[in-house]
A protein has these predicted regions:
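Aromatic-Pro/Gly-enriched surface loop or interdomain linker
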Residues: 1-25, 30-34, 55, 63-165
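Short, hydrophobic beta-strand segments
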Residues: 17-20, 25, 38-52, 60
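Short alpha-beta junction capping motif
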Residues: 83-86, 165-204
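Short alpha-helical segments and helix-capping/turn motifs at coil-helix boundaries
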Residues: 41-45, 57-59, 65-75, 183-187
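The substrate-binding groove and active-site-proximal loops of carbohydrate-active enzymes
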Residues: 44-47, 122-132, 169-182
């Protein structure tokens, strides 16, 4: 997704052959924490070696005409001198109510909300894309249209690899990127101390 010859809708990089639909096992919900976990079997693999770093939407279409999205971020290996756009996966997980409770509410409301979240389930928001289309996509299109040297990582990358933004000129957080781990926060603070600019577009 991004800006391609004044087309903000994106460009198709990959298409699979028709895939069989697999009957998956029933998802599990932890009765104590409310964690929803879909331990499903994969029936497809997407080759990423030839993909440019960036954010991709995978569109899944059925023979009946139904469709949904899945997110894919190809992380930039070298962000030196680049403006890094951070994709907020943890906030998507917090608001996701697919198959069970989110961090905000369950069947009864706030009292039986999930205390533990899993990314191993589809996303109920944005036709499967989470909050990306509303809060991140316009930012990506604007940055790429302006010719800014962009790079891409997720918030999980910041939490798990402090060097993922080493040498970046700036880090951009799109709207509503509100769920952080302590490790992510430390990574950003340390980068800021070393001179990396931090920019927040409505993230609280």
């Amino acid at each position: 997704m991004g800006s391609y010859s004044n087309d903000s809708q994106g460009f198709a990089y990959w298409k699979s052959e028709e895939l069989p639909c697999l009957k998956q096992k029933k998802l599990s919900i932890d009765p104590v924490t409310g964690k929803v976990f879909a331990d499903w079997v994969s029936n497809a693999a997407i080759p990423t070696n030839d993909l440019y770093p960036g954010f991709y939407l995978i569109k899944i279409e059925s023979q009946l005409g139904h469709a949904a999205f899945m997110n894919l971020t190809v992380r930039s290996e070298d962000v030196t001198g680049s403006v890094v756009i951070v994709i907020p996966t943890m906030t998507n997980a917090a608001y996701n109510r697919w198959g069970g409770p989110s961090a905000y509410r369950g069947k009864k409301g706030f009292e039986d909300r999930a205390r533990v979240l899993s990314m191993d389930r589809p996303n109920s928001l944005g036709f499967g894309s989470g909050k990306y289309l509303n809060y991140v996509h316009p930012l990506v299109v604007e940055a790429e249209s302006a010719g800014i040297a962009t790079a891409y990582v997720t918030d999980v990358d910041l939490a798990s690899d402090p060097q993922s933004i080493s040498g970046a000129s700036a880090i951009i957080f799109g709207g509503h990127d509100e769920y952080w781990t302590l490790q992510e926060r430390n990574t950003v603070i340390n980068a800021r101390k070393l001179g990396t600019n931090t920019i927040f577009f409505g993230a609280n």
